[in-house]
UniProtKB/Swiss-Prot annotation:
Top EC category: hydrolase
Effect of disrupting the coding gene: Deletion mutant accumulates specific cell wall fragments and shows growth defects under starvation conditions.
EC number: 3.2.1.92
Keywords of the record: Cell wall biogenesis/degradation, Hydrolase, Secreted, Signal
Temperature dependence: Optimum temperature is 37 degrees Celsius. Stable from 4 to 37 degrees Celsius.
Keyword Cell wall biogenesis/degradation assigned: yes
Name this protein carries in UniProt: Peptidoglycan beta-N-acetylmuramidase NamZ
Length: 414
């Protein structure tokens, strides 16, 4: 079932309007490509019509909040005569997805709907009572990517807190984990390293849907919101995003493809170093490199490790923004050749340790402490600096990972 080489967006978009009357071969081919899975926004209005009638809705969303026909959640709610969309809330990158990572997004009036849009990234990460004064139900419809340091899940957590504090029900419109729901990897975040790229003690790769995470956050971390998860239909844990046949809309500017979501928990750690993680290229998180790296040397060394489900190709690139902007970088491109066997965190740690060992005079962990925040602790960086093997590092967190796995099972919906 799994593909050995990723299918790109064009393969995902081959579905359209299907007419029941047609029986032509072309129609059959189109039907075969029809999405298997219905997300929360698809099941919301049919399943919760009575509960929503006459309610004022606040919606936290971004461009990836679409139904199976690519219609925006904003438009779906705004056009429904039985409810009133009264407020929009934008996470990092904004409701329309037009801001780069780290850019603050201001509040404004949405041009299409006339609904006020409030930013939840920057100084204000939690909806205020003033923002919620005309809201009866607060909804969340954003595509997560299954990695702890992707900030949308903490936008959700803060919004759940605000809903609890203001006596407002909170609804999560569930969506697939693009990486599937069976694999968990990586160290558990230690509380002293909590930040907006890691708020709670969960593993780096959690293997949960956004709705399942909401349930876990709500109970395990005592948010206690009046939470409803609007479930998907037909999603199975073994499915990656391609298996759902849903259209993939990039959830953030540097997450352009399904392939990006798979490599992100590996090379996202590189953001905490002086190595480019490929921002400013057309292959963010797939391309990694720096001016001082020798591409062929790195390619050969990494491939000699025989890491499962991944192959490295020597590559050079010039980032148009972010680290090493306008400077020729040399490194590798990652190709995930088997999604089921690929171990993202092991791969990421192996890449960082290999570059550290090959270029000790040039490689650096950033002085901002960002690597420790991404890793969720300080000891992984120390172990890499001290020459500890990747296997030893992984063994150091396996016990706590297994403990989390037991807790996680209580909140699995599918």
């Amino acid at each position: 079932m799994r593909k050995t080489i990723f299918a790109f967006l064009t393969g995902l978009m081959m579905f359209g309007t299907i007419t029941a009357a047609s029986a032509s071969p072309d129609s059959k081919n189109q039907t075969a490509k029809k999405p298997k899975v219905q997300t929360g926004i698809d099941t919301l209005l049919p399943d919760y019509k009575k509960q929503l009638k006459g309610k004022r809705i606040g919606l936290i969303t971004n461009p990836a909040g679409v139904n199976t026909s690519l219609k925006s959640s904003v438009d779906i709610l705004y056009e429904n005569p039985d409810i009133k969309l009264t407020a929009l809330f934008g996470p990092e990158h904004g409701v329309r997805g037009d801001a780069q990572a780290g850019d603050e997004v201001g509040s404004y009036i949405d041009e299409k709907t006339g609904v006020p849009v409030y930013s939840l990234y920057g100084k204000t990460k939690k909806p205020t009572p003033e923002m919620l004064k005309n809201v009866d139900i607060l909804m969340f419809d954003i595509q997560d990517v299954g990695t702890r340091f992707y900030t949308y899940i903490y936008t959700m957590a803060y919004a759940m807190e605000a809903a609890k504090e203001n006596g407002i029900p909170f609804m999560v419109l569930d969506r697939p984990n693009p990486q599937g729901g069976n694999h968990i990897e990586g160290p558990i975040l230690e509380p002293e390293y909590a930040s907006f790229v890691g708020l709670y003690p969960i593993p780096l790769k959690h293997g949960m849907t956004i709705g399942e995470l909401a349930s876990l956050f709500n109970k395990e971390f005592s948010i206690d919101a009046d939470l409803t998860v609007v479930k998907m239909k037909h999603w199975k844990r073994k499915m990656d995003f391609d298996d759902t046949r849903l259209p993939f809309v990039l959830p953030s500017p540097n997450m352009p493809t399904v392939e990006s979501t798979f490599v992100y928990p590996a090379t996202g750690l590189i953001e905490g170093t002086n190595i480019s993680e490929g921002r400013g290229t057309t292959k963010p998180f797939e391309l990694i490199g720096a001016p001082f790296i020798k591409s062929t040397e790195l390619e050969e060394t990494l491939n000699s490790l025989h890491l499962p489900g991944v192959t490295f190709r020597a590559a050079s690139f010039t980032p148009t923004f972010s680290k090493h902007q306008g400077t020729l970088c040399h490194g590798v491109q990652l190709y995930v050749t088997d999604r089921d066997k690929f171990e993202a965190v092991k791969t990421g740690l192996s890449v960082i340790k290999t570059i550290h060992d090959l270029y000790p005079e040039d490689f650096e962990f950033l002085s901002t402490g960002s690597f420790d925040k991404l890793a969720g602790n300080g000891w992984i960086r120390t172990k890499i600096e001290n020459g500890t093997s990747v296997e030893n590092i992984i063994n150091s967190y396996e016990k706590t990972l297994q403990q989390f796995s037991k807790t996680r099972k209580k909140y699995l919906i599918y």
